[in-house]
From Swiss-Prot:
The lineage of its organism: Eukaryota, Viridiplantae, Streptophyta, Embryophyta, Tracheophyta. PROSITE patterns: FE2OG_OXY (PS51471). Expressed in coleoptiles, leaf sheaths, leaf blades and root tips of young seedlings. Expressed in vascular bundles of mature leaf blades. Expressed in developing culms and nodes. It comes from Oryza sativa subsp. japonica (Rice). Pfam families: 2OG-FeII_Oxy, DIOX_N. Plants overexpressing SLC1 are infertile and exhibit defects in shoot development characterized by slender and crinkly leaves. This is Probable 2-oxoglutarate-dependent dioxygenase SLC2.
Amino acid sequence: MAILERAEEANIGEGSGSSEWELGVRQLCDSGITTLPARYVLPPADRPARYVTPPALLPVVDLAALRARDPCQLAALHAACRDYGFFQLLNHGVPPDAMLYAARRFFFDLPLPARKRYMSADIRAAVRYGTSFNQLNDAVLSWRDFLKLLIRDTRRLADVLPSWPDAPDDLRPAAAAYATACQRLFRELMEAALDALGIVRCRRQLLEECDAGSQMMMVNCFPACPEPELTLGMPPHSDYGLLTILLQDEVRGLEVSYGDGGGWAVVEPLPGAVVVNVGDHLEILSNGLYRSVLHRVRVNGRRARVSVASLHSLAAERVIGPAAELVDEQRGRPRRYMDTDMAAFLAYLASAEGNHKSFLHSRRINTISSSGLTQPSN
């Protein structure tokens, strides 16, 4: 399709109510498209390059050994969070099959009217079926549909469960079991991370707040794309919150930023493992010792990909900043981040800033070097 034709196509439906793209990528695929609609075509500089690097071999952490207080595994966890911001976790106890099966059925088998019941552009909605990444502000849309399930207080899962989709029949129980398993896993990993960081004074309070924190499950669907080299399933971003636990199927797609040259390495799915990554809040809490790393999703021309991300945060009203034990001006460890909360994040999402830099970047404090010049804190 010529560029002019794509541009004309992008304007169809503007100002006339619901456009076809607003119904999601799955609906576009069902309509039989053979070329990528203009709304999804990235500028040449932003398009994913052909694979030129081998799959990323993320650090592997064994939770069974971590539970046994193996100092080598605690050191491995610390190094992974510090150097990579990502790791693969084995022996985690999270039952993956039922959740992925239910997710596939939800996205691929249900007719549009059943899915459309939960469709919304409201980023604050607790249950939301949506498309793209931040569809109100995205200049170019992402090749992704998703189901968002938000639990504002993880102690009250039973209260929110009735609002979750009741079709297919096995989605709600599978999602509830998966959410509970991820909550337990998050608690264990946070205990280990606080130990590795040497956070003692506020450890108990933080863990209690983790138990009463929020959990957002994002069930992602990336259908097979007619021109995958022109678009992305998700643009480069970091995750809000403390930790994200990602369950993915066997189809490659997750890519992690590495080095200073803007390179991307695809993550090879490890059978039986979940992927865990550091979120913005944990980088802030650690005062920059741990890294919340940019990542993105590329799409496949032949196969659909499904993933389930469980993002864990403290309560929405909780203000978080660097742990006092990790800030010491006299020893060269200045405070590197402003305090933040969910309100600041939602305001950021609603602004135009989200199109060109990460939320974490907006919370960093510039420091004064010995030469008197202002420098970024990391």
